[in-house]
């Protein structure tokens, strides 16, 4: 792309020497200007196509990441449910109020431990 800046043209800046002397020169200059504009439009078109491709790839990536985040959210909810269940069971075990319940639990667990050791040794 060219770095042309457009500014207001003062009448004093125009001289007869700057102006083409024949219609053929005017036509040639106009064709050159049109060709330059076509070349610049082609560059702009290429840039637009590149940006379109990039935006399409970004959209695809966002769709994939959205799906992955949804899956992660579902797995987190499942894990949270399982953790809540385990915490409730632990709370129930640790809140045995009376000593007789605690003693019964200790005896049952001890008997289970001895049974497992006996089975492993035999």
Swiss-Prot record:
SMART domains: t_SNARE (SM00397)
Subcellular location: Membrane
Keyword Membrane applies: yes
Listed GO MF terms: SNAP receptor activity
Annotated keywords: Coiled coil, Membrane, Neurotransmitter transport, Transmembrane, Transmembrane helix, Transport
Species in which this protein is naturally found: Caenorhabditis elegans
Protein name in UniProt: Putative syntaxin 6
PROSITE patterns named in the record: SYNTAXIN, T_SNARE
């Amino acid at each position: 792309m060219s770095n042309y800046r457009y500014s207001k043209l003062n009448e004093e800046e125009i001289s007869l020497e700057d102006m083409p002397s024949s219609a053929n020169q005017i036509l040639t200059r106009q064709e050159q200007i049109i060709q330059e504009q076509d070349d610049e439009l082609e560059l702009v078109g290429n840039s637009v196509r590149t940006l379109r491709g990039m935006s399409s790839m970004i959209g695809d990536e966002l769709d994939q990441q959205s799906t992955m985040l949804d899956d992660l959210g579902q797995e987190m909810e499942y894990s949270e449910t399982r953790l809540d269940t385990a915490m409730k069971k632990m709370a129930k075990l640790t809140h045995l109020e009376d000593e007789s319940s605690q003693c019964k639990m200790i005896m049952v667990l001890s008997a289970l431990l001895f049974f497992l050791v006996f089975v492993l040794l035999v």
